[in-house]
Amino acid sequence: MAKNKSQYDSTLNLPKTLFEMRAGLPKKEPVMLKDWDDNDLYNQLMKHNEGKPQFILHDGPPYANGNIHMGTALNKIIKDIIIREKNMEGYQAPYVPGFDTHGLPIELKALSSVGDKKKDISKLELRQICEKFATEHIDIMSDQFKRLGVIGDFEHPYLTLKPEFEARQIEIFGEMAKKGYIYKGLKPVYWCPDCRTALAEAEIEYGEDDCDSIFVRFHVSQDPNGVLAKYGIPMDKTYFVIWPTTTWTLPANEAICLNGQFEYSFVKIGEEYHIMATDLVKSVMDACHIENYEIVGEPVSGAEFELMRYNHVYLPKEGWVILGDHVTLESGSGCVHTAGGHGVDDFNVCQKYPQVPITVPVDDGGYLTELAGKYAGQRVWAANKTILADLTASGAVMGQVHIKHQYPHCWRCHNPIIFRATEQWFCSIAKFREDVYKAIDTVTWMPDWGHDRMTGMVRDRNDWCISRQRTWGVPIPAFYCKKCGTYHITDATIKAVSALFRKEGSDAWYKYDAEQIIPAGEVCEKCGASEWEKDTDIMDVWFDSGSTHAAVLDERPELRFPADMYMEGGDQFRGWFQSSLLTSVASKGCAPYKSVLCHGWVVDEQGKQMHKSAGNGVEPSEIIKDYGADIIRLWVASSDYTVDVRAGKNIFKQLSEAYRKIRNTARFILGNLDGFDPNTDCVADDQLQDIDRWALAALDDLIVNTNAGYAVYDFNKVYHAVYNFCVVAMSNFYLDVTKDRLYCTNGAARKAAQTTMYKILVALDKIIAPILCFTSQEIWDFMPKTEGMNKYVVFEQMPKAGQYAADDAFKAKWAQLIAVRDEVKKVLEQARAEKLIGASLEASVTLYCNDAVYDLLNSIPMDELADLMIVSHVELVKGEGGAASAVEGLGVAAAHATGDKCERCWKYSASIGSHPAHPTLCARCASVVEA
């Protein structure tokens, strides 16, 4: 306490603890992790909470192909905070981590690992390499999750490559097929030419691309309804004007689509007539830089042009004019280039016209075929330029516009994709869409906009393409009749495939011929034949992870269906949230979750996306090395994770300072509990001072606020409540005010302060335990214990509000006392500036009060009031005087305290030297020393 050594230093009760000021988390945390592992902490916790109500947070499986990043850390820590808090709240909350292990990224990694041999290895060999790769990364990622403090059954995670998982997935497929939700058909799907496979909507990302859109004219060849003659327009000089943005699809053009509700005009340019939507004439002419034109006659309904014919712009074929509601007046010409093989709207409208063929002049790799004529062999992106050049030279192009638009890219290789009609397996969403809407309404969405977002996505989506033309995945369990090609899926075949996969895994599909798998006696329902071939496609990985409600929740005895919560990033509305919802509603008739909680993306300190190329990323391993995992956990808790979360070295540096204040609050209390035995030293409530009761009331408010925050998963609210309590209520006030009786006395007053601090620290440590899992355990290890307290703080129950609650009158009284204290501090600062005093204990304060303020202050013993102000003397005077203050009826005056300074407590007192053996001590300190 003193700068110079005093003979009485040894008589002071100065704080003493081995709990270090410097956290040293990077070194301490691994030691704790080893202890948790050695003592099987997770299973102990589950056993400890056995018989309590369950809370099931179902883990969305991360993809097992790399190190974790800050987004993964955010996700896992949010889940861990929830799991720890629920276990402390009175639930048994198991956590079974999962891993998504099939799919293209792992397959591509496996292929690159074998180099030139990839053409020679069998599918079975490739799958074995993929499995090895996935398994290695499961181990790596599990260790990284555990290093973050995540608690769970990492010894028994669920893996989508496990035989029992694959078997259950086959059964879900079978249940959906039995209800008529699974079919195979020709439809345009997202297709990645580089990965040579179909993609689901959830596997698409959008990026801004440049393209040249052109206005192209197609010559009218037939007018079966006599429309042109009716209006006096010569057919040999008449054209439809279209506006394709993907020139490479022109070889697939089989129709031009108009809207039957719109009006169309004949626009004369020179001696030729061009048909386009009346409302778009000016914009088309402006885009084509055509000034001299004439609109001939009155507008004509689009419906009149139906089934006219036109010549393809360069191929020797005719197309049809058809009608569709998807045609709008937002842009273009109102005459839409229609290639049923390369667009969903195009395909759907062509289905209404049997005479319009579906042409797909593009192969798996994105190369034009002989159907494209002279452009055969060109990749679609290159063909854009050559086709444009040729059409321009031929005079077919009326105008060209350079535009930027959002274009779909493959989320695996990040290259542009195409729409391409191929034979694929689909899940028919339309057949149970209404049931999905009803299921969405039963779910609690957090934030609540999730309800409308999911509803909109389900409403707008097409049928789900669930097949992929790759090797590493769960095979589509379908057989084909060798004689007629009809596909064959029955209860018996599903049961046989599921049993085989449960026994040997899905590799068995590649080990055995169809006849060795399909049950005996199965015959083709179309032709009666009984010779079979196996389907060669695998399932979309979103069907894998979307089956976890059955393969995990139903199968694991410690879990149950439906889960209480799914919690992932916002991108999973089109991913796991949705695929799980669809398969669950389709197979079980209800949602797989009671609530859905979502978080945002992690961005850099400026709010920009993190990219390695930009050098603005930060890795969890870096932060752990510099600060420890608890600082990452504090970052998660301090953030509003419902929006994008900023991360960067400056942010973590600031958080380490906030962490230090919380830690030092605990350290100060631990230091003052040295020698305190809560089993024998705690005093009764009636022995507490008023300020102790205030501190406990502040603790009760903290419990109320943090419990409310945890209840709605608002950890930001918890963090701010804890931080403000530690800094404002404790460090800046209560702990400061109580130093004198802690350091300088040994009686009931000191034990009252210790009792209060002990109760505060026990509750505070439990409150921070879900967030600062390492630091809270370190505090717990140093804390004196009462009987019945557990070795691990996570085994404790969260503190309940109400035990230390104060009435409104008490709170109002102390709010006014603190306001008086603040006014005294202002006057002391002024006295210090005027060199009247140095430390506040050199001051004597006179408080001039009206009756109300006098009664308030006089209700506190004068020595306690002096301690509250941290001065040596306080005098109350009724009446006006001193410096005016913000407290009505209060004036404050400060003077240097009279008497001498006590060598032990530093207070000024007239009683110095009253004890002959201690001439430099005040009477109080002398009696303590002599005791």
Predicted features and spans:
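Residues immediately within or flanking Cys/His clusters that coordinate Zn2+
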Residues: 189, 407, 478, 521, ...
